[in-house]
Design a protein with these regions (language model features):
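Mature secreted bioactive peptide module from preproproteins
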Residues: 24-108
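N-terminal prepro-regions of secreted/extracellular proteins
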Residues: 1-40
Length: 108
């Protein structure tokens, strides 16, 4: 019984680790001096930064599902959702002047 439980626990841990490793992501902190940027990133295209009074993150992967998201200094989070290859995932929140603004991309 103990061996069966140990094997089941080990298998569950391996599956959880594998699913976490299937995700690929990146992030950047956006400050008042950070410019709005866009360019190639991890097999796709990432547009991010401060746009007017908003913090944005838009990501599309060319061959896999992609997602853009952002969080401001008030912990307001916006998730563009998982989108199929070649489709933009767009997120936007209000930019906070006191910092804590961060943008993310992810693909799987």
């Amino acid at each position: 019984m103990i061996i069966a439980t140990l094997l089941l626990t080990t298998a569950s841990t391996a599956l959880a680790t594998a699913s976490l490793n299937d995700r690929h992501s990146g992030s950047e902190v956006v400050s008042e001096t950070t410019r709005y940027e866009d360019g190639p990133m991890a097999g796709g295209w990432w547009t991010r930064g401060k746009s007017g009074s908003n913090l944005i993150s838009e990501y599309k992967h060319y061959t896999k599902e992609g997602r853009g998201s952002c969080r401001n200094g008030n912990a307001t989070f916006s998730d563009g959702g998982w989108k199929p290859a070649e489709t933009w995932s767009k997120s936007k929140v209000g930019y906070t002047l006191l910092g804590g603004n961060k943008v993310y991309y992810d693909y799987k």
